[in-house]
UniProtKB/Swiss-Prot annotation:
Gene transcribed to yield this protein: allA
Function: Catalyzes the catabolism of the allantoin degradation intermediate (S)-ureidoglycolate, generating urea and glyoxylate. Involved in the utilization of allantoin as nitrogen source.
GO terms of molecular function: ureidoglycolate hydrolase activity; ureidoglycolate lyase activity
Subunit: Homodimer.
Keyword terms of this UniProt record: Lyase, Purine metabolism
InterPro entries found in the cross-reference section: RmlC_Cupin_sf, UAH_cupin, Ureidogly_lyase, Ureidogly_lyase_bac, Ureidoglycolate_lyase_dom_sf
Enzyme category, top tier: lyase
Cofactor: Ni(2+)
Family the entry assigns: Belongs to the ureidoglycolate lyase family.
Organism: Pseudomonas fluorescens (strain Pf0-1)
HAMAP family attached to this UniProt entry: Ureidogly_lyase (MF_00616)
Catalytically driven reaction(s): (S)-ureidoglycolate = urea + glyoxylate
Keyword DNA damage (UniProt): no
Protein name: Ureidoglycolate lyase
Length: 167
């Protein structure tokens, strides 16, 4: 099994998979009589049809035992999915490029700085949320509507990956 190298999350490195939601290096303008900086359109919510709705939820995630065997990835073919950390803790991201099935050899892992969120583009393969802390909360923006919006792919045993603890 291949051990994934955990990369720091940057906009450039994550661009094939989605958007990094952060203020650092992002354009902004002043609103509210000059008392507020607006970092505008850091990500776009994608939905498949005009009947779909963008919704906001909170996910409360428990940490996984490390090292973690990455045996599956999921994707949301009908909409994007954003995770914004509410408690300021770094979290791990495991992704693979668009495709009918994820390719084990193309899987990448990232770690946020605790102030970054991410928005997976429609159809991007990813692991379910991976918190580093014992328990963590995330604001999630995704799609509600008709149709199955979650495909899962389980890797064959020889395709599985290892995610080691973040140092």
């Amino acid at each position: 099994m291949r051990t994934l190298t955990i990369e720091p999350l940057t906009k450039e490195a994550f661009a094939p998979f989605g958007d990094v939601i952060e203020t650092d290096g992002s354009d902004h303008f002043m609103i509210n009589n000059g008392s507020t900086m607006r970092f505008h359109k850091l990500a776009t919510v994608e939905t498949a049809t005009p009947e779909d709705n963008a919704i906001i939820s909170i996910f409360r995630a428990d940490a996984q035992d490390m090292p973690l065997t990455v045996s599956m990835l999921e994707r949301h073919p009908l909409g994007s999915q954003a995770f914004i950390p509410l408690l300021g803790n770094p979290f791990l991201i495991v992704v693979a490029p668009l495709g009918d099935v994820p390719v084990s050899g193309l899987v990448r892992a990232f770690v946020t700085n605790g102030r970054q969120g991410i928005n997976y583009h429609r159809g991007v393969w990813h692991h379910p949320v991976l918190t580093i802390e014992k328990r963590d909360d995330f604001l999630v923006v995704d799609r509600s509507g008709k149709g199955n919006n979650c495909d899962e792919h389980f890797f064959k045993e020889d395709e599985r990956l290892i995610l080691a603890p973040h140092q």
